[in-house]
Amino acid sequence: MPLELVTVPCLSDNYAFLVHDAASGETAVVDVPEAGPVMAALAERNWRLTQILLTHHHGDHVAGVAALREATGARVAGAAADAHRLPPLDLALAEGDRVRIGSEDGTVLEVPGHTVGHIAFHFADSGLAFTGDSLMAMGCGRLFEGTPRMMWQSLRKLSALPADTLICSGHEYTQANARFACTLEPENPVLIFRVGSIAAARKEGRPTVPSQLSDEIATNPFLRAGEAALKAAVGMADAEDAEVFAEIRRRKDNF
């Protein structure tokens, strides 16, 4: 049976994710921007929290960890490389390590760029990838610590996951990201269609996260930096893919 996913809005535009295994009763949360909404979502479902999985060290992803750990006794797992600036870890993780929820193993992927110690969690059997602020719906995280080439390689790693994977990213930035994408390719019909779908979802108050990887591959400019059409759109037809990515990221930073 696939893991059950609940998207929990936090702060002004963050998301935490509850991941529940019905057979065992185990529940994990991925990132804890604040404890209150996560505890409310657990109580509403009468779920028992057993694990806290962290993608990176930024405060808007870990601020609620201490309170949630104290309330539930859940074990905390995060990147070994960032152990010195994460809340105290019970389990320090690196590329290829496994985390288990019930009977399903998830694989740890190192995806530096937004931060140098950023990790993602891929639960292949349930088709879920928790990407934090690396790959995001219609976008990617700012490069606060890593280089453009580093982030491009991380995005390529994530884009190689199965196309029907649900990308569970950390923020509701999708509509702004879509507006930026339209400045690059204002006449791209696939992009225009997705922009309309995003606008409709937000008008109805629905989250646009998670998104499907196939949609990101088709419309997310940060995943498409290697495509001839997008290279031409930014005037870099003969440039290396990582250089095109860097230019797209520069433009987004100034958008």
From Swiss-Prot:
EC number(s) per UniProt? 3.1.2.6
Q: Where does Zn(2+) 1 bind?
A: 56, 58, 114, 133
This protein's pathway:
Secondary metabolite metabolism; methylglyoxal degradation; (R)-lactate from methylglyoxal: step 2/2
What does the record give as the reaction this protein catalyses?
an S-(2-hydroxyacyl)glutathione + H2O = a 2-hydroxy carboxylate + glutathione + H(+)
What are its cofactors?
A: Zn(2+)
Does the keyword section mention Ubl conjugation?
Answer: no
- State if Hydrolase is listed as a keyword: yes
Return any one Pfam family short name.
Lactamase_B
Superkingdom, natural source: Bacteria
Q: Which residues form a coiled coil?
A: none
Q: Which InterPro entries match?
A: Clx_II_MBL (IPR035680), Glyoxalase_II_hydrolase (IPR050110), HAGH_C (IPR032282), Hydroxyacylglutathione_Hdrlase (IPR017782), Metallo-B-lactamas (IPR001279), RibonucZ/Hydroxyglut_hydro (IPR036866)
Question: Which residues does Zn(2+) 2 bind?
Answer: 60-61, 133, 171
Which free-text remark accompanies the cofactor?
A: Binds 2 Zn(2+) ions per subunit.
Q: Which GO terms describe its molecular function?
A: hydroxyacylglutathione hydrolase activity; metal ion binding
Query: What does the UniProt keyword field contain?
Result: Hydrolase, Metal-binding, Zinc
Q: Tell me one GO biological process term.
A: methylglyoxal catabolic process to D-lactate via S-lactoyl-glutathione
Subunit structure of this entry?
Monomer.
What's this protein's family per the entry?
Belongs to the metallo-beta-lactamase superfamily. Glyoxalase II family.
Q: Which NCBIfam families match?
A: GSH_gloB
Q: State what this protein does.
A: Thiolesterase that catalyzes the hydrolysis of S-D-lactoyl-glutathione to form glutathione and D-lactic acid.
Q: What is this protein called?
A: Hydroxyacylglutathione hydrolase
Q: What is the lineage of its organism?
A: Bacteria, Pseudomonadati, Pseudomonadota, Alphaproteobacteria, Rhodobacterales
Per the record, the gene is: gloB
